[in-house]
Amino acid sequence: MKWDKEKLEGYNPGEIEAKWYDFWEKEGYFHQDPDLSREPYSIVMPPPNVTGQLHMGHALDNTLQDILIRFKRMSGYNVVWIPGTDHAGIATQVKVEEQLAKEEGKTRYDIGREEFLKRVWAWKEKYGNRIEQQVRRLGSSCDWSRKRFTMDDICARAVREVFVALYEKGLIYQGHRITNWCPHCHTALSDIEVDHKDEAGHLWYVKYPVIGEDDYIMIATTRPETIMGDTAVAVNPEDERMKKYIGKKVLVPLVNREVEVIADDYVDIEFGTGAVKITPAHDPNDFEMGERHNLESIMIMNLDGTMNAAAGKEFDGMTLKECRKAVVSDLEKLGLLDHVEELNHAVGHCSRCKTTVEPLSTKQWFVRMKPLAEEALAAVDRGDTKFIPGRFTKIYDHWLENIQDWCISRQLWWGHQIPVWYCDDCGEVSASRTDLTECPHCHSKHIHQDPDVLDTWFSSALWPFSTMGWPDKTPDLQHFFPTSVLVTGYDIIFFWVARMMFATCEFMKEVPFKDVFIHGLVRDSQGRKMSKSLGNGIDPLEVSDMYGADALRFTLVTGNTPGNDMRFYMERVEANRNFANKIWNASKFVIMNLEDYDPEFVPTTDDFTLADRWILTSFNQVVRQVTKGLGSYELGDAAATVYDFTWNSFCDWYIELAKQRLYKSDDKRSRQTAQYVLVRVLTGALALLHPFMPFVTEHLWQHLPHEGESLIVAPWPTVDEALDFAEDAATMNIMMEAVKAIRNMRAEANVPMGKKAPVTLVPADEAMAEVLHTYETYFKTLAFVDEVHILKTTDAKPENAVVTVVPRSEVYLLLKDLIDVEKETARVAKEQEKTRGEIERLEKKLSNKGFTDKAPEAVVAKEKEKLAAYREKAEALNKRMEDLKHL
């Protein structure tokens, strides 16, 4: 039996958190080698950007993972949690480009690719560990010896293998398609790198003359500057107004190009005029329509966002803004602009440089997704991978069923350079797992590698198996793969979860993870998404410094339900810091009463009091509930259960009852039994709390009698059936109801705290009478009672008393000598009058249709809640007044 007997001072989160993280890591508790005799449990950490700083989303994500890992470690599983960071292509490149411009006044082109990449690697080495230190600060017990980086040698080898294998199967190809293009960063962007903002714009109504007729089709467009790239006008085949135009030719304004009116179901009959211009090179939906109808695609913009010669000599070289102004002016002069309407619409911006993103048809590398999506869909359909909550399966299925080919090339320098070489002599295109020095076809030395790099998500898609050393058959891969669970937000199901599924199903022939545990976003107290623009972001490290990482973790988990967003309140962090302090003080009290503790002493069941039997039974029940909650991803419920047990059952009830026996030096066996129960239940509660609040629980556990070296590897509490006393626990609960009834009656009657009240109890049966007689001291200890009278049901009931009925008993509180009845009657009457006034005011307000029809729904609901509360209060005051009349 071990036991740190050093005196426990006041609770200081900062001191203990640094101490215990270093201890765990130094002792190697985060690391486990593959052990075939134990069931594996593995998680790969979603890699934060190497440029990143910890935000509340990271804090939630890592807290949930750490809770699961600590629970499974204590439950005896062979556990591994692999951390790592993502090279974050464009994000990192932009950071270094900004630094280069600021410090040297140069661009990356000025210093060249090789030198620029040296600078990026140097920046990564200098700042890349910052996010790791922040993850540590939260208490994340991941195995840092297995740390991976998406561009380290192991991951780079996996990336090459996957690219070349897909290329050889014809699943990677080069072609022209619409991509999100940033004219400033000069690269294609993934959808997640585009921020959509509502902007005030216009809808221009333009006439397209019908060839050979004195007629025209009116189209509505938000982008008149792209008219010169139009190669068709489309209408819905079901639109009766437009059927007569299908197959006819119209003239595209300004460039006088003859184009056909085509029919396509995509066209929304209700939008604009029901006719739309089709510009395949500059709109993703138009591109798809162009593919269906074999339309010409005309690029009228340069990659820097200016107009080119194909737009017409007049517009060549103009910026988009200049071109729009000129086009609108020319349309007006020609009498082809009918009218303009104001319109708010979403406009995409590059998330890094904030430039407006242009949909452009550019030559890129793509992954052919439909063949790969089939097995990823089937695996979830078979139940090989389950989404928690299950409703997210539909979102996953819908995306994969409607998937488009994936653009994987980026016009950046930082990232995995595409492993494709072009021969300058014979034109051969070669994909290779190793760097080429000559053309495999003609052996020419005149070859060059594709300058583009892969989308960051390409390497991230391989994360579940590349982190374990694939393509080598490593011990980690053989034992820990597939991983047990992926913990992630619902916002990246498309970008990451689905891609990991298809990549792993293709290359590992099994799923990457058995479960996908989805959480929501952390929003501010008003329900808004945290963002730089709103200035409402909260730094988790600042919160940890103020209240402790344990309090932050507990706030994040108790406010969280699977798949749902949560609101973050600083008041809750403070309350959970108070909870940690409560546990600290309770532990301090127990430790102070262990001077004569005998670790060899084991009481018999006869030694246990009613309170002992109740708390031991309650602890068993809590072990069941918390274990079940953690096993079914109801982490918030599990945390709330152990919180309620520790604060209420143990601290507020059991410790108070145990004090009588601890202070009785004449009954050694009773004192020893109380010590035994206190230590057993407190160390057990600390173990249950450990996954949620690892630091404070480790510290307190070390100061209590225990077996083993550290709580992080201590056995998870189990139910001891021999210490289940269901009937006694039920009886104790009745006693507690009676105590609470007395407390409530005292509070309602405004009995001063210093005055003890005589109580009369009338049990419903002999068995209950015996319990009340045996444990009447509980009422004196917990309910501030000086006298307890126990009557038979046939005895006369006391007069001048208020009464409450609890299970199997009636409770009478004699108030006459405790309060000034006249004064209390006047106070209650005044409160009744005030309450009636509030009820009248709210009833009048809610009967006003001007208010109920115009006010926001939430405001009306709030007023209804207030009215219900005041009506409830009025009933309580009426009862109180009746009680006073009988005193």
Name every feature range the model reports, one short phrase each:
Residues 1-9, 80, 222, 367, ...:
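Auxiliary tRNA-acceptor-end handling modules of aminoacyl-tRNA synthetases
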Residues 5, 19, 26-27, 97-216, ...:
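Residue patterns forming the tRNA-binding/recognition surfaces of aminoacyl-tRNA synthetases
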Residues 205, 398-458, 462, 506-549, ...:
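Feature 926 captures the class I aminoacyl-tRNA synthetase adenylation module centered on the KMSKS loop
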Residues 35-96, 159, 220-221, 226, ...:
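N-terminal catalytic cores of NTP/NDP-binding nucleotidyl/phosphoryl-transfer enzymes
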